[in-house]
């Protein structure tokens, strides 16, 4: 069995005909996140994938086997949700909640794509988005996913969070409640501009 152990850097240009002749390794997103994997090329050949830990393969990547042969990566069709909305605010709220759950998302023009999840589909529908189940390649945004942070002047935070928590509780049959006390007080005044829609001073009191 051949071992595939190298990925050619994306900035290295290869002849298109050379890449086109290479056998394809077609994988869903979850499999493309694994650095150790037993897989089958589109030719029917079984191979072992042994890449540096933390490697996430993307559609179009070119790999090198231990015999020097090239293998091209293709994103497989898989069950996904296509999320659209009647306005930018609704789509932004949808993206916010998905990011708050560290959900991998592929961002398109006026559309979000994520792996199929009935709980998330329900939540997104209640937020006012249109959710369509489909079969398509999935290639989410690359980068680190961080936790969300609540801001006191986010006027819709409480409403959005309550809706998301309600959906989660209905699907999982229980709720989790976390309370955090902070023993510090500080006030600060500052003027800042948010853009053409906001230009005013704010006084924040945090407790």
UniProtKB/Swiss-Prot annotation:
InterPro entries: UreE, UreE_C_dom, UreE_N, UreE_N_sf
Pfam families membership: UreE_C, UreE_N
An annotated GO cellular component: cytoplasm
Disulfide bonds, paired cysteine numbers: none
Record key words, sorted: Chaperone, Cytoplasm, Nickel, Nickel insertion
Compositional bias of kind Basic and acidic residues: 170-194
GO MF annotation: an example: nickel cation binding
Keyword Mitochondrion: no
Record region (Disordered): 170-207
Gene Ontology process terms (BP): protein folding; protein-containing complex assembly; urea metabolic process
Entry keyword Cytoplasm: yes
UniProt-annotated location(s): Cytoplasm
Family: Belongs to the UreE family.
Function: Involved in urease metallocenter assembly. Binds nickel. Probably functions as a nickel donor during metallocenter assembly.
UniProt xrefs under HAMAP family: UreE
Name of the featured protein: Urease accessory protein UreE
Biological source species: Burkholderia pseudomallei (strain 1106a)
